């Protein structure tokens, strides 16, 4: 069973018998191009958790650079590594537990869609530990995030644009 987790409210309008998106609001900054990773050192906070997948970010040196930039910003940094492709409920809940213990101000997801999807769901459970996956699947029924932590996504692939959407695809393998 897959959960399509909704972590933020999205507004859309339906046209004359045809689904049309008449407005797309993106109230956050998007940095791109050479040097954009360096913007991490401008984040304000005390603690950041870096959520990554299978190791390509580490092998290519991006994980070390991101960690160093966050430390330059004066933050204590914790790594959550090993998010699998098609992230599981178990991985999300494990990450949420780590976040509850560490209490980050920033959640930084790096990699493809899987670590970003997982980190967004972890963020929801970090901010609202009593919520269930079933609660998160109800459209337009989730409280605002950003009360405990802010979220940054660093995508390494092009795909579903999870870095700019309010959705996560999480798989229940049970």
Feature map (PLM): residue ranges:
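Glycine/serine-rich anion-binding loops at beta->alpha junctions
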Residues: 104-120, 156-162
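Short Gly/Thr/Asp-enriched flexible loops that form oxyanion-binding sites at enzyme active sites
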Residues: 96, 115-128, 164-165
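Glycine-rich, phosphate-binding/catalytic loops in enzymes
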Residues: 66-69, 124-126, 169-170
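Short, charge-rich binding segments
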Residues: 97-114, 142-147
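A glycine/threonine-rich phosphate-anchoring loop and its flanking beta-alpha core
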Residues: 28, 128-174
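Hydrophobic/aromatic beta-strand patches that form the interior of the parallel beta-sheet core
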Residues: 78, 108, 150-154
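ATP/NTP phosphate-donor binding region
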Residues: 5-106
């Amino acid at each position: 069973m897959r959960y399509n987790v909704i972590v933020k409210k999205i507004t859309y309008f339906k046209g004359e018998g045809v689904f049309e998106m008449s407005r797309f609001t993106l109230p956050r900054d998007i940095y791109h191009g050479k040097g954009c990773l360096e913007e991490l050192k401008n984040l304000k906070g005390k603690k950041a958790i870096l959520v990554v997948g299978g190791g390509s970010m580490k092998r290519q040196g991006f994980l070390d650079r991101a960690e160093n930039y966050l430390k330059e910003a004066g933050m204590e940094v914790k790594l959550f590594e090993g998010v699998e492709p098609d992230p599981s409920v178990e991985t999300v809940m494990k990450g949420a537990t780590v976040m509850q213990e560490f209490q980050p101000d920033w959640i930084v997801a790096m990699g493809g869609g899987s670590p970003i999807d997982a980190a967004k769901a972890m963020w929801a459970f970090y901010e609202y530990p009593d919520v269930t996956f079933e609660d998160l699947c109800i459209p337009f029924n989730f409280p605002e995030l950003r009360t405990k932590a802010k979220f940054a996504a660093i995508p390494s692939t092009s795909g579903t644009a999870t870095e700019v959407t309010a959705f996560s695809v999480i798989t229940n393998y049970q």
